[in-house]
């Protein structure tokens, strides 16, 4: 069963938006979208919070997400999160059958 992961990245002085920009411009976003089992990977900027970025990340199943978490890209993502001193909040959702 597919599921969606919402990740809220929060920083200071525009760092969350810079993180999303660098993720996109570095090609990491396209690599993740090309991974087996990834169904959606998109960043959004809340209208009422300039210091937060929402990532909506959808996976076919837990196995696909586990493979993503074991990929080398996770080290790159973690390094960027550290570079921009971001805090994360994660929510997981499944479809209503």
How would you describe each model-predicted region?
Residues 17-21, 60-70:
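Short amphipathic alpha-helices within nucleic acid-binding modules
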Residues 4-10:
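Active-site-flanking beta-strand signature of metal-NTP-handling nucleotidyl enzymes
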Residues 10-14, 59-60:
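Structural beta->alpha junctions
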Residues 29-53:
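Short, glycine- and small/hydrophobic-rich beta-strand elements in well-ordered beta-sheets
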Residues 2-4, 52:
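A general secondary-structure signal for short beta-strands and their flanking turns/coil
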Residues 42-51, 76-97:
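Glycine-rich beta-strand-turn "strand-cap" elements at beta-sheet edges
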Residues 15-38, 73-77:
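Short amphipathic alpha-helical segments
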């Amino acid at each position: 069963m597919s599921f969606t992961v919402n990740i809220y990245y929060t920083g200071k002085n525009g760092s969350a938006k810079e993180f999303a920009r660098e993720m996109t411009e570095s090609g990491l976003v396209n690599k993740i979208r090309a991974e087996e089992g990834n169904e959606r990977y998109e960043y959004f900027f809340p209208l009422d919070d300039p210091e937060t970025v929402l990532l909506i990340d959808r996976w076919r199943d837990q196995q696909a997400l586990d493979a993503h978490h074991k990929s080398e890209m996770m080290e790159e993502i973690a390094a960027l999160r550290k570079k921009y001193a971001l805090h994360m909040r994660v929510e997981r959702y499944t479809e209503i059958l």
